[in-house]
Regions:
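Beta-strand-rich domains and repeat architectures in extracellular enzymes and scaffolds
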Residues: 1-13, 166
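Conserved beta-propeller blade repeats
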Residues: 30-48, 65, 72-90, 119-132, ...
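Feature marks short, surface-exposed loop/turn motifs that line or immediately flank catalytic pockets
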Residues: 3-5, 95, 153
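Conserved beta-strand and immediately adjacent loop positions that scaffold enzyme active sites
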Residues: 14-16, 54-56, 131-133, 167
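Predominantly five- to eight-bladed beta-propeller fold
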Residues: 13, 89-141, 146, 151
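Generic domain-boundary/flexible-linker signal
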Residues: 8, 66, 79, 98-99, ...
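Multi-bladed beta-propeller domains
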Residues: 18-34, 58-74, 106-112, 136-164
Length: 167
């Protein structure tokens, strides 16, 4: 559920759990940032979600939130291996230099270098590619890096517009 703060002119999404037969809801999170992409670990023991650009787990009652990833610049999605030995996560990768990379003496430049027909998709500029990374999952250790299984490829997975990580 998203709550709006008029003074800050923004909304915050929190997670709830609903007992369908009884119709009872339990608020799981109450933070000043967004939680999204909720799911369950394959063993059914923990609720998983994205918050602050990272993967988190918590008990089904909302207690003991634990950050699973600590990936620089954050992640966009995730999937656990059925045996929970690995996690695949999505992360944006910059492959082409930006104007600021090429011209550091022009830090305020708002230019773009376009050398491909696919430079914009719907309402987004294409300035990075979403790649799949795979990492070992050890519950007590935050994941700080993974293997880019698409390294150097100028393709995305999943393909825009995102239809879900299962693509």
């Amino acid at each position: 559920i998203t709550y709006f703060n008029k003074e800050e002119d923004r909304g915050y999404s929190d997670l709830y759990l609903m007992n369908l037969p009884e119709g009872q809801t339990t608020r799981l999170t109450d933070t000043d940032y967004n939680e999204s992409d909720a799911g369950w670990t394959p063993d059914g023991k923990f609720i998983t979600y994205l918050a602050k650009g990272q993967l988190w787990e918590m008990n089904p009652d909302g207690s003991n939130p634990r950050q699973v990833t600590d990936i620089p610049d954050g992640i966009n999605g995730y999937v656990y291996a059925p045996d929970m030995s690995k996690i695949v996560y999505l992360k944006d990768v910059q492959l082409e230099p930006t104007v600021q990379d090429l011209y550091p003496d022009l830090p305020k430049a708002k230019a773009r270098i376009v050398d491909d027909q696919f430079y914009r998709h719907w309402n987004d500029w294409v300035d990075a590619y979403t790649h799949l990374f795979i990492a070992d999952y050890v519950p007590a250790q935050p994941i700080t890096t993974g293997k880019d299984i698409m390294e150097g490829e100028r393709w995305e997975s999943p393909v825009r517009p995102w239809g879900g990580v299962e693509q």
